[in-house]
């Protein structure tokens, strides 16, 4: 038979013939792990001001090609920069950076 205190608190338990008071409390469900690691750095991305943007359009002082040992060239199209290089074995490598 059901515990009288439990039946008083939960009257529908009295309808169950096989109800017995649980001897151990139910196990707690563990808290799920976070989806992403906690962000340590609180820094925010800084937007460029109009003055800084106008300065970035100046011609770079970096050379656009190198010596014959490791030839490479730099080209720009809009907001993209491409670096073309070729190894001594003839392997061609292209690096494209979209700003």
Curated annotation (Swiss-Prot):
PTM field: Phosphorylated by host ERK. The phosphorylation triggers a structural change that enhances keratin binding and protein stability.
Primary site of residence: host cell
Any Pfam family matching the protein: Pap_E4
Low complexity biased stretches: 51-67
InterPro entries found in the cross-reference section: Papilloma_E4
Source organism, top-level taxon: Viruses
Residue segments, region Disordered: 48-67
GO biological process, one term: symbiont-mediated arrest of host cell cycle during G2/M transition
Keywords: Early protein, Host cytoplasm, Host G2/M cell cycle arrest by virus, Host nucleus, Host-virus interaction, Modulation of host cell cycle by virus, Phosphoprotein
One GO cellular component, as annotated: host cell nucleus
Compartment annotation: Host cytoplasm; Host nucleus
Family, per entry: Belongs to the papillomaviridae E4 protein family.
Assembly and binders: Assembles into oligomeric complexes. Interacts with host CDK1. Interacts with host SRPK1; this interaction may favor expression of late viral transcripts. Interacts with host cytokeratin components KRT8 and KRT18.
UniProt miscellaneous comment: The major E4 form is first synthesized as an E1^E4 fusion protein from spliced E1^E4 transcripts, such that the first few amino acids of the E4 protein are derived from the N terminus of E1.
Role according to the record: Contributes to multiple aspects of the viral life cycle including viral genome amplification, suppression of suprabasal cell differentiation and egress of newly formed virions. Induces host cell cycle arrest at the G2 phase by associating with and preventing the nuclear entry of host CDK1/cyclin B1 complexes. Inhibits cellular DNA replication by preventing loading of host replication licensing proteins MCM2 and MCM7 onto chromatin. Within the cytoplasm, associates with host kinase SRPK1, a splicing factor regulator, and inhibits its activity.
Name by which UniProt lists this protein: Protein E4
Organism in which the protein naturally occurs: Human papillomavirus 31
């Amino acid at each position: 038979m059901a515990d009288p205190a439990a039946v008083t608190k939960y009257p529908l338990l009295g309808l169950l013939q096989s109800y017995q008071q649980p001897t151990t409390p139910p196990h707690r469900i563990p808290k799920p792990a976070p989806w992403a690691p906690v962000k340590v750095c609180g820094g925010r991305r800084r937007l460029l001001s109009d003055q800084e943007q106008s300065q970035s359009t100046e011609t770079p002082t970096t050379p656009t090609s190198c010596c014959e040992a490791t030839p490479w060239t730099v080209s720009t199209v809009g907001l993209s920069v491409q670096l073309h290089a070729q190894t001594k074995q003839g392997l061609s490598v292209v690096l494209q950076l979209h700003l």
